[in-house]
């Protein structure tokens, strides 16, 4: 019996060795579930990269971006691949079909290597600037920040 395309589920298509830790030894993982985000993903990446650069300076932290393509029908996966080729901090996971946002978040959390892990939607409904405040709140002693 031939393999179905569903055997790809949960398989990461890139190498995780590029993830490093900054001067403070802190790695921040940003898990981004994506479904048909071809228009918003480049904008999200641009905005999140700005914040990552600021936090690398302010906190001495390194970032990894984990884009989880949840079986998109548009160019979301191709865009994630392009971002990975241009930026070693970018990783991606591709599902063979749509399994839902929760499955995407779970796969991203399992793949995350960071000391801190945040999830954020690619549609920019959440303020990307909140990342800095969230890390500060966590470092102030909170167990969970949202």
Where are these regions (language model features)?
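Structured catalytic core of nucleotide-sugar glycosyltransferases
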Residues: 13, 22-146
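Short, positively charged and aromatic/hydrophobic N-terminal segments
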Residues: 1-6, 13-20
